[in-house]
């Protein structure tokens, strides 16, 4: 097969019955995996999975010619030689300032207890980040929480050191996500989602579902809909914009709207069980 990185490479004789559909790279180590370059699938597209329960640090990494690229701190669940999903008990996936270039992968999944995005993440058709202690299926569609319940139902994101809070999904000022559609899921103990960078869906929706709060001081832009749902407070100090669909912010407590929400061809919905504060 012809490759971008290594030119012509010989086929694997152990795969005489056909190309691999899923390539699972499972690391059992006390240390996180550090990815600083590219991985390429030679031949027909395949799904690429890198799994390390101790964490994954990507800084200038990327995957070429993958249908789906998954970085996870979960343990791979394999039945009869078939990958079924991942069981996440902890661990963090960190993307450094040099970013993650999966622009030649169709879909990118980050599945971990926490995700910290300090650089850009690119993928062709979709990016989905799922955080928390969960059982997650192989395509990141079914998510079942298996960690301790937040039985006192407190807002775990609130403390006196606002900027030093810990979030399940944290996108810094230099961080960003760029794909046709983007979905962030905080299914943890209510630590929430913070975006100080740029989350941009070039052809579809941006969806954020959080068991805690959602704090946006950056830019969230969607070609279709921007749909933010939180159990706790939604605080917008930045910019939320849609070109064709609605911008919807739904909170089970309150919405604090201090930034701008622009819906060029749709409507703006602020829905809350308590109150909406606008300044």
Predicted features by range, described:
Residues 1-202, 209-212, 219:
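Solvent-exposed adhesion/ligand-recognition segments of exported proteins
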Residues 1, 110, 129, 167, ...:
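All-beta strand scaffolds that present successive hydrophobic residues in beta-strands
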Residues 63-64, 71, 98-103, 121-122, ...:
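Sequence/structural signature of small/polar-enriched beta-strand/turn repeats
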């Amino acid at each position: 097969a012809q490759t971008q990185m290594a030119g012509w490479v010989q086929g694997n004789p152990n795969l005489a019955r056909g190309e691999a559909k899923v390539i699972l790279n499972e690391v059992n180590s006390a240390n996180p995996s550090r990815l600083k370059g590219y991985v390429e699938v030679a031949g027909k597209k395949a799904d690429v999975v890198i799994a390390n329960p101790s964490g994954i640090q990507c800084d200038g990494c990327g995957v070429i010619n993958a249908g789906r690229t998954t970085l996870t701190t979960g343990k791979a669940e394999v039945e009869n030689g078939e990958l079924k999903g991942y069981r996440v008990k902890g661990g963090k996936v960190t993307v450094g300032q040099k970013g993650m270039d999966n622009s030649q992968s169709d879909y990118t999944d980050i599945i971990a207890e926490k995700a910290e995005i300090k650089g850009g993440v690119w993928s062709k058709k979709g990016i989905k980040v799922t955080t928390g202690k969960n059982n997650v299926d192989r395509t990141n569609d079914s998510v079942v929480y298996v960690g301790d319940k937040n039985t006192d139902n407190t807002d775990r994101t609130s403390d006196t050191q606002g900027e030093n809070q810990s979030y399940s999904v944290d996108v810094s000022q230099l961080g960003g996500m760029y794909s046709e559609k983007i979905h962030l899921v905080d299914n943890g103990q209510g630590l929430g989602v913070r975006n100080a960078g740029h989350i941009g869906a070039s052809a579809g929706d941006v969806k954020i579902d959080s068991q805690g709060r959602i704090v946006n001081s950056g830019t969230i832009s969607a070609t279709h809909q921007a749909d933010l749902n939180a159990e706790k407070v939604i605080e917008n100090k930045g910019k939320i914009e849609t070109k064709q669909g609605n911008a919807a912010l739904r909170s089970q407590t309150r919405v604090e709207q201090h930034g701008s929400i622009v819906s060029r061809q749709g409507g703006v919905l602020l829905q809350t069980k308590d109150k909406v504060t606008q300044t």
